[in-house]
Amino acid sequence: MIGEASQAGAQVVALPEAALTGYGPDMVARVSSREVTQAEDEVKEACRKCKIAAIIGTPSKGYNSALVINSDGSEVVRQHKMQLVPTDLPWSRPGDTLHTFSLGGVTCSVIICHDKRYPELVRLPVLAGSRVVFYISAESYHDDLPLPAPRDGVRWDEARLSRELGVYRAQAQARAVENRVWLVKSNWAGDAVQPTRGSHGQSCIVDPTGCVVEEAGIYDEALICHTLDLDQASALYAHKSLQPEYALSGWWREALARVRRVGDE
Protein backbone atom coordinates (compact mmCIF):
# COMPACT_ATOMS: atom_id res chain seq x y z
CA MET A 1 0.00 0.00 0.00
CA ILE A 2 2.88 2.39 0.73
CA GLY A 3 4.41 1.82 -2.69
CA GLU A 4 1.01 2.06 -4.38
CA ALA A 5 0.29 5.37 -2.64
CA SER A 6 3.67 6.75 -3.66
CA GLN A 7 3.11 5.73 -7.28
CA ALA A 8 -0.25 7.50 -7.16
CA GLY A 9 1.54 10.71 -6.23
CA ALA A 10 0.53 10.87 -2.58
CA GLN A 11 2.77 12.65 -0.09
CA VAL A 12 1.22 10.93 2.95
CA VAL A 13 -0.48 7.55 3.37
CA ALA A 14 -2.65 6.62 6.37
CA LEU A 15 -3.13 2.98 7.41
CA PRO A 16 -5.64 1.69 9.99
CA GLU A 17 -5.50 1.18 13.73
CA ALA A 18 -3.15 -1.69 14.68
CA ALA A 19 -2.40 -2.23 10.99
CA LEU A 20 0.97 -3.80 11.83
CA THR A 21 -0.50 -6.69 13.83
CA GLY A 22 -4.23 -6.76 13.32
CA TYR A 23 -6.61 -5.33 15.89
CA GLY A 24 -7.64 -7.07 19.11
CA PRO A 25 -5.98 -8.73 22.09
CA ASP A 26 -5.61 -12.13 20.42
CA MET A 27 -3.86 -10.71 17.37
CA VAL A 28 -1.59 -8.43 19.38
CA ALA A 29 -0.64 -11.29 21.73
CA ARG A 30 0.60 -13.40 18.83
CA VAL A 31 3.32 -10.88 17.97
CA SER A 32 6.38 -10.22 20.12
CA SER A 33 7.67 -6.72 20.84
CA ARG A 34 10.76 -7.59 18.80
CA GLU A 35 8.60 -8.50 15.81
CA VAL A 36 6.63 -5.27 16.17
CA THR A 37 9.85 -3.24 16.22
CA GLN A 38 11.13 -5.11 13.17
CA ALA A 39 7.87 -4.46 11.30
CA GLU A 40 8.00 -0.77 12.22
CA ASP A 41 11.56 -0.57 10.88
CA GLU A 42 10.44 -2.18 7.62
CA VAL A 43 7.69 0.42 7.25
CA LYS A 44 10.19 3.22 7.92
CA GLU A 45 12.48 1.82 5.24
CA ALA A 46 9.58 1.57 2.79
CA CYS A 47 8.75 5.23 3.46
CA ARG A 48 12.37 6.19 2.86
CA LYS A 49 12.59 4.25 -0.40
CA CYS A 50 9.24 5.50 -1.67
CA LYS A 51 9.78 9.06 -0.37
CA ILE A 52 6.38 9.16 1.30
CA ALA A 53 5.24 9.90 4.85
CA ALA A 54 2.99 7.42 6.66
CA ILE A 55 0.72 7.12 9.66
CA ILE A 56 0.20 3.53 10.78
CA GLY A 57 -1.41 1.85 13.77
CA THR A 58 0.87 -0.20 16.01
CA PRO A 59 0.88 -1.70 19.52
CA SER A 60 3.62 0.39 21.07
CA LYS A 61 5.09 -0.48 24.49
CA GLY A 62 1.75 -0.91 26.17
CA TYR A 63 -0.14 1.65 24.08
CA ASN A 64 -2.45 1.55 21.09
CA SER A 65 -0.52 4.01 18.95
CA ALA A 66 -0.38 5.85 15.67
CA LEU A 67 3.22 5.86 14.48
CA VAL A 68 3.99 8.90 12.33
CA ILE A 69 6.89 8.47 9.89
CA ASN A 70 8.41 11.16 7.68
CA SER A 71 9.23 10.71 4.00
CA ASP A 72 12.91 10.19 4.87
CA GLY A 73 11.99 7.20 7.06
CA SER A 74 12.53 9.00 10.35
CA GLU A 75 10.07 8.66 13.22
CA VAL A 76 8.17 11.87 13.93
CA VAL A 77 5.98 10.98 16.91
CA ARG A 78 3.76 8.31 18.43
CA GLN A 79 0.26 9.43 19.30
CA HIS A 80 -1.35 7.06 21.81
CA LYS A 81 -5.07 6.36 21.84
CA MET A 82 -6.67 8.44 24.59
CA GLN A 83 -10.10 6.84 25.02
CA LEU A 84 -10.00 3.04 25.21
CA VAL A 85 -12.69 0.42 24.66
CA PRO A 86 -12.92 -3.07 26.25
CA THR A 87 -10.95 -4.74 23.44
CA ASP A 88 -8.04 -2.35 24.09
CA LEU A 89 -7.76 -2.97 27.81
CA PRO A 90 -5.94 -6.36 27.79
CA TRP A 91 -3.00 -4.90 25.89
CA SER A 92 -2.93 -1.11 26.18
CA ARG A 93 -3.31 1.83 28.52
CA PRO A 94 -4.60 5.31 27.64
CA GLY A 95 -2.34 8.06 26.38
CA ASP A 96 -2.19 11.36 28.23
CA THR A 97 -0.87 13.81 25.62
CA LEU A 98 -2.16 15.17 22.33
CA HIS A 99 0.32 16.09 19.59
CA THR A 100 0.61 18.23 16.51
CA PHE A 101 3.34 17.51 13.98
CA SER A 102 4.47 18.64 10.55
CA LEU A 103 4.32 16.51 7.39
CA GLY A 104 5.36 18.17 4.15
CA GLY A 105 5.25 21.55 5.85
CA VAL A 106 1.64 21.08 6.97
CA THR A 107 0.67 20.90 10.65
CA CYS A 108 -1.33 17.74 11.32
CA SER A 109 -2.75 15.64 14.14
CA VAL A 110 -4.13 12.12 14.54
CA ILE A 111 -6.84 10.38 16.56
CA ILE A 112 -7.47 6.65 16.92
CA CYS A 113 -10.89 4.98 16.59
CA HIS A 114 -12.98 5.62 19.74
CA ASP A 115 -11.23 8.99 20.16
CA LYS A 116 -13.54 10.34 17.45
CA ARG A 117 -16.46 10.37 19.89
CA TYR A 118 -14.69 13.02 21.98
CA PRO A 119 -14.64 16.26 19.95
CA GLU A 120 -12.12 17.95 22.23
CA LEU A 121 -9.45 15.46 21.08
CA VAL A 122 -9.74 16.99 17.61
CA ARG A 123 -10.38 20.62 18.52
CA LEU A 124 -7.43 21.05 20.87
CA PRO A 125 -4.80 20.05 18.26
CA VAL A 126 -6.62 22.23 15.72
CA LEU A 127 -6.33 25.17 18.11
CA ALA A 128 -2.62 24.32 18.31
CA GLY A 129 -2.31 24.58 14.52
CA SER A 130 -3.45 21.27 12.99
CA ARG A 131 -5.16 21.67 9.62
CA VAL A 132 -5.29 18.00 8.59
CA VAL A 133 -6.68 15.49 11.07
CA PHE A 134 -5.85 11.84 10.41
CA TYR A 135 -8.24 9.32 11.89
CA ILE A 136 -7.13 5.67 11.93
CA SER A 137 -9.54 3.03 13.13
CA ALA A 138 -10.84 -0.50 13.46
CA GLU A 139 -14.40 0.65 14.05
CA SER A 140 -16.94 -1.61 15.72
CA TYR A 141 -20.49 -1.29 17.02
CA HIS A 142 -21.35 -0.68 20.69
CA ASP A 143 -21.18 -4.45 21.28
CA ASP A 144 -17.59 -4.52 19.93
CA LEU A 145 -18.64 -6.50 16.84
CA PRO A 146 -18.17 -5.21 13.28
CA LEU A 147 -21.34 -3.67 11.90
CA PRO A 148 -21.78 -6.37 9.17
CA ALA A 149 -21.46 -9.21 11.74
CA PRO A 150 -24.51 -11.32 12.65
CA ARG A 151 -26.09 -10.75 16.05
CA ASP A 152 -27.88 -13.74 17.60
CA GLY A 153 -27.32 -15.46 14.27
CA VAL A 154 -29.03 -12.73 12.24
CA ARG A 155 -27.39 -10.08 10.07
CA TRP A 156 -28.89 -6.63 9.72
CA ASP A 157 -30.79 -5.98 6.52
CA GLU A 158 -29.44 -3.41 4.08
CA ALA A 159 -31.64 -0.61 5.43
CA ARG A 160 -30.47 -1.11 9.03
CA LEU A 161 -26.82 -1.47 8.01
CA SER A 162 -27.06 1.71 5.94
CA ARG A 163 -28.53 3.63 8.88
CA GLU A 164 -25.79 2.46 11.23
CA LEU A 165 -23.04 3.20 8.70
CA GLY A 166 -24.45 6.70 8.35
CA VAL A 167 -23.75 7.37 12.03
CA TYR A 168 -20.06 6.55 11.63
CA ARG A 169 -19.78 8.64 8.48
CA ALA A 170 -21.53 11.54 10.21
CA GLN A 171 -19.04 11.54 13.08
CA ALA A 172 -16.12 11.95 10.68
CA GLN A 173 -17.98 14.72 8.86
CA ALA A 174 -18.79 16.48 12.13
CA ARG A 175 -15.17 16.51 13.32
CA ALA A 176 -14.16 18.13 10.02
CA VAL A 177 -16.87 20.76 9.64
CA GLU A 178 -17.11 21.80 13.29
CA ASN A 179 -13.41 22.73 13.11
CA ARG A 180 -13.21 23.67 9.39
CA VAL A 181 -10.26 21.34 8.69
CA TRP A 182 -9.58 18.31 6.48
CA LEU A 183 -10.14 14.84 7.93
CA VAL A 184 -8.55 11.70 6.45
CA LYS A 185 -10.01 8.44 7.76
CA SER A 186 -8.38 5.01 7.36
CA ASN A 187 -10.53 2.11 8.59
CA TRP A 188 -10.22 -1.66 8.32
CA ALA A 189 -12.29 -3.13 5.49
CA GLY A 190 -15.13 -5.50 6.27
CA ASP A 191 -14.79 -9.24 5.63
CA ALA A 192 -17.69 -10.53 3.53
CA VAL A 193 -16.72 -14.18 4.13
CA GLN A 194 -16.02 -13.90 7.87
CA PRO A 195 -18.06 -10.86 8.92
CA THR A 196 -16.98 -11.08 12.57
CA ARG A 197 -13.51 -10.05 11.40
CA GLY A 198 -12.34 -6.64 10.25
CA SER A 199 -14.59 -3.59 10.42
CA HIS A 200 -16.89 -1.95 7.87
CA GLY A 201 -14.48 -0.10 5.60
CA GLN A 202 -15.64 3.23 4.20
CA SER A 203 -12.30 4.93 4.63
CA CYS A 204 -12.87 8.47 3.47
CA ILE A 205 -11.56 11.99 3.00
CA VAL A 206 -13.76 14.80 4.30
CA ASP A 207 -13.30 18.43 3.32
CA PRO A 208 -13.53 21.37 5.76
CA THR A 209 -17.20 21.93 4.92
CA GLY A 210 -18.03 18.36 5.99
CA CYS A 211 -18.48 16.93 2.48
CA VAL A 212 -17.10 13.45 1.78
CA VAL A 213 -14.94 13.90 -1.32
CA GLU A 214 -13.57 10.33 -1.50
CA GLU A 215 -14.84 7.11 0.07
CA ALA A 216 -13.93 3.42 -0.15
CA GLY A 217 -16.42 0.56 -0.11
CA ILE A 218 -17.41 -1.60 2.83
CA TYR A 219 -15.57 -4.79 1.89
CA ASP A 220 -12.78 -3.59 -0.40
CA GLU A 221 -9.20 -2.87 0.63
CA ALA A 222 -8.76 0.21 -1.53
CA LEU A 223 -6.46 3.18 -1.85
CA ILE A 224 -8.30 6.49 -2.09
CA CYS A 225 -6.42 9.69 -2.92
CA HIS A 226 -7.27 13.36 -2.99
CA THR A 227 -5.35 16.62 -3.33
CA LEU A 228 -6.13 18.71 -0.25
CA ASP A 229 -6.71 22.41 -0.82
CA LEU A 230 -5.24 23.70 2.43
CA ASP A 231 -6.60 27.19 1.84
CA GLN A 232 -10.00 25.73 2.74
CA ALA A 233 -8.74 24.65 6.17
CA SER A 234 -9.27 27.90 8.03
CA ALA A 235 -10.04 26.37 11.45
CA LEU A 236 -12.65 29.13 11.65
CA TYR A 237 -15.09 27.48 14.03
CA ALA A 238 -12.35 26.09 16.25
CA HIS A 239 -10.84 29.54 16.75
CA LYS A 240 -14.18 30.91 17.90
CA SER A 241 -13.62 28.84 21.05
CA LEU A 242 -10.79 31.23 21.96
CA GLN A 243 -12.70 34.49 21.50
CA PRO A 244 -12.47 36.49 24.76
CA GLU A 245 -16.22 37.04 24.88
CA TYR A 246 -16.90 33.28 24.71
CA ALA A 247 -17.71 32.00 28.20
CA LEU A 248 -15.57 28.84 27.86
CA SER A 249 -12.54 30.43 26.17
CA GLY A 250 -10.51 30.24 29.38
CA TRP A 251 -11.16 26.51 29.65
CA TRP A 252 -9.96 25.94 26.09
CA ARG A 253 -6.82 28.01 26.64
CA GLU A 254 -6.01 26.04 29.78
CA ALA A 255 -6.61 22.72 28.01
CA LEU A 256 -4.20 23.70 25.21
CA ALA A 257 -1.39 23.01 27.67
CA ARG A 258 -2.07 19.29 27.09
CA VAL A 259 -1.07 19.57 23.42
CA ARG A 260 2.58 18.96 22.58
CA ARG A 261 3.73 20.67 19.40
CA VAL A 262 6.36 18.32 17.98
CA GLY A 263 9.19 20.31 16.41
CA ASP A 264 8.61 23.38 18.57
CA GLU A 265 10.73 22.10 21.46
Residues covered by each model-derived region:
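Non-catalytic positions within long, well-ordered alpha-helices that form the structural scaffold/packing
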Residues: 3-6, 126
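Short, conserved active-site loops that position catalytic residues or coordinate cofactors/metal ions
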Residues: 5-32, 137
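Short beta->alpha transition motifs characteristic of CBS
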Residues: 21, 28, 67, 78-85, ...
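CN hydrolase (nitrilase-like) catalytic-core segments centered on the catalytic cysteine
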Residues: 35-55, 116-223
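Active-site catalytic loop in hydrolytic enzyme cores
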Residues: 45, 60-170, 235-243
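Short beta-strand scaffold segments in enzyme catalytic cores
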Residues: 56-58, 64-68, 99, 203-205, ...
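A conserved C-terminal secondary-structure "cap"
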Residues: 231-265
